[in-house]
Structure formats: structure tokens, C-alpha cells
């Protein structure tokens, strides 16, 4: 925890500066003109120069050209949709699959309320939140890895056979 220096309002020098309107920059460096005129343009122009330089030096295609007459056997979404895709793929009832898919963001909306149950920040002193996080992470990884496998091996990750 940092130490905050509080100004002594009984100091006559500080009172004179506050009377002149100089109190807000008394502790630190002003943003105008140092940051706004010198540092920000360098950062912005440097970022633009890096992007243009990479585009000129390494002009690569964005993906492969599409072939409208050849559809792949297994269409996979982007990697961050793998767990939800796996839920839709393995649940036989479509309505139940959609309800489970909707429950993912609804469950994430409950996280702030679960976090505020305990005032401690140490994860070892918040066992409920830590357990929910670890189980959720394990399930998301399990579903995400399973989405990349064929449907027969997706639930067991190919580790054992279910007959």
C-alpha cells in the first residue's frame, strides 16, 4: 500500500500558490504541454509507422481463397468458440443445447456477485470463488480440446473407450 502525501493547508507558501490557482499541478508534472504535444504524437505516429512497415515488408494474404463448390467435412469455428461449439455438438436436444449455450454468459454475469461475498483478495481465503474458477477453467479447457476431436472421441478426449 502506497503512502499518500497530504498537503499542509496551513503552510503560507502553499496557500499563496493555491490563491494564484497553481494548486492542481503542485505535486507532479503537468500533462500540457509535455504529454499532449510531445509524447502522444510520437507514440501514435510510431504505431502507425510500425503497422505500415509491417504491411509493406510482409504483405501476406488473409487466409486461403474460398472455394464455393467444396465444403469441408467438419466446419470449425474460431478457437474461442470451441467450448460453446462442443456443447451444441454433444447435447442431443437442440433446445437444451441452446439453453446451455445461453447459460454461459449468464453464469459469467454472476461472477462479480460471487466475488463480493468475501472481502479478502487472497484466493486461498476465498474458497468458493477459487473453486468455481478452477472448475470453470477445467470444463472450458475440456470442452475446447474436445471440440477439435472427432465426435466419437470428443467427450473422453480419446483417453478411454465408451461402449
From Swiss-Prot:
Superkingdom: Eukaryota
PROSITE patterns: CYTB_CTER
Single GO MF descriptor: electron transporter, transferring electrons within the cyclic electron transport pathway of photosynthesis activity
Chief localization: plastid
Function: Component of the cytochrome b6-f complex, which mediates electron transfer between photosystem II (PSII) and photosystem I (PSI), cyclic electron flow around PSI, and state transitions.
Secretion signal, residue range per the UniProt entry: none
Keywords: Chloroplast, Electron transport, Membrane, Photosynthesis, Plastid, Thylakoid, Transmembrane, Transmembrane helix, Transport
Organism placement in taxonomy: Eukaryota, Viridiplantae, Streptophyta, Embryophyta, Tracheophyta
Residues spanning the membrane: 36-56, 95-115, 131-151
Compartment(s): Plastid, Chloroplast thylakoid membrane
Gene Ontology CC entries for this record: chloroplast thylakoid membrane
Membrane topology category: Multi-pass membrane protein
Biological process according to GO: photosynthetic electron transport chain
Pfam family, one: Cytochrom_B_C
InterPro entries assigned to the protein according to its UniProt record, in alphabetical order: Cyt_b/b6_C (IPR005798), Cyt_b/b6_C_sf (IPR036150), Cyt_b6/f_cplx_suIV (IPR005870), Cytochrome_b_C_euk/bac (IPR048260)
UniProt protein name: Cytochrome b6-f complex subunit 4
UniProt record similarity statement: Belongs to the cytochrome b family. PetD subfamily.
Assembly mode: The 4 large subunits of the cytochrome b6-f complex are cytochrome b6, subunit IV (17 kDa polypeptide, petD), cytochrome f and the Rieske protein, while the 4 small subunits are petG, petL, petM and petN. The complex functions as a dimer.
Amino acid at each position: 500500500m502506497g503512502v499518500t502525501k497530504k498537503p499542509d493547508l496551513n503552510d503560507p507558501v502553499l496557500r499563496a500558490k493555491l490563491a494564484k490557482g497553481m494548486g492542481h499541478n503542485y505535486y507532479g508534472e503537468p500533462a500540457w504541454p509535455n504529454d499532449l504535444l510531445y509524447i502522444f504524437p510520437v507514440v501514435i505516429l510510431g504505431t502507425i509507422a510500425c503497422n505500415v512497415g509491417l504491411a509493406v515488408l510482409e504483405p501476406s494474404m488473409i487466409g486461403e481463397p474460398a472455394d464455393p463448390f467444396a465444403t469441408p467435412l467438419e466446419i470449425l469455428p474460431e478457437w474461442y468458440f470451441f467450448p460453446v461449439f462442443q456443447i451444441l455438438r454433444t447435447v442431443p436436444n437442440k433446445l437444451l443445447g441452446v439453453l446451455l449455450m445461453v447459460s454461459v454468459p449468464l453464469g459469467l454475469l454472476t461472477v462479480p456477485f460471487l466475488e463480493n461475498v468475501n472481502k479478502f483478495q487472497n484466493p486461498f481465503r476465498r474458497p468458493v470463488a477459487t473453486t468455481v474458477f478452477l472448475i470453470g477453467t477445467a470444463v472450458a479447457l475440456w470442452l475446447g480440446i474436445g471440440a477439435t476431436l472427432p465426435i466419437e472421441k470428443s467427450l473422453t478426449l480419446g483417453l478411454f473407450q465408451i461402449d
